[in-house]
A protein has these predicted regions:
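Acidic interaction surfaces
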Residues: 1-151
């Protein structure tokens, strides 16, 4: 498979993972929502405790501190776009948001998330690759950027 095509397909997969709650944020860092990966990285152990008849999962950190699973911040599609370079909005004659084109990488290759065309687009030295963004994911991206536009 072409390296550029694989790259844009991986971007679509990463965005879908963010949108589905497959990542969480702890200590300002991003982790897959997989307790084994988190504990391997942080050196913690997983325990469960019965609290007033409910079973709660928590992580015991190396310093002895406890983090309850419910206290972890689930990453959203907005977190995926927390560090973009530029954005072009498509605005209707009624001045309402319609779509956007977000520059997420540049300088080799340039990569855009385009919700009008529903594609991740990569361009680099005459090479071009694109991957389709599923409708439900595109709607989540548009929902986030419509909120940003209206702020």
């Amino acid at each position: 498979m072409d390296r550029n095509l694989e790259h844009v397909q991986n971007i679509v997969k990463d965005m879908a993972d963010f949108a589905s709650g497959s990542y969480f944020i702890y200590g300002g860092r991003l982790f897959p929502y997989d307790e084994n990966d988190f504990c391997k990285e942080e050196g913690c152990t997983i325990q469960q405790e019965n609290i007033f008849g409910d079973i709660h999962t928590f992580y015991v950190m190396p310093d002895g501190g406890k983090i309850f699973e419910g206290d972890l911040e689930i990453a959203t599609i907005g977190d995926y776009f927390s560090d973009f370079y530029d954005i072009d909005y498509v605005i209707g004659s009624d001045k309402k948001y319609k779509a956007c084109r977000v520059l997420v990488a540049f300088g080799g290759p340039n990569i855009y998330i385009d919700t009008w065309d529903r594609q991740v687009q990569l361009e680099w030295w005459g090479e071009h690759a694109e991957a389709h963004i599923p409708n439900d994911l595109c709607e989540q991206i548009d929902g986030f950027f419509e909120m940003v536009y209206n702020c």
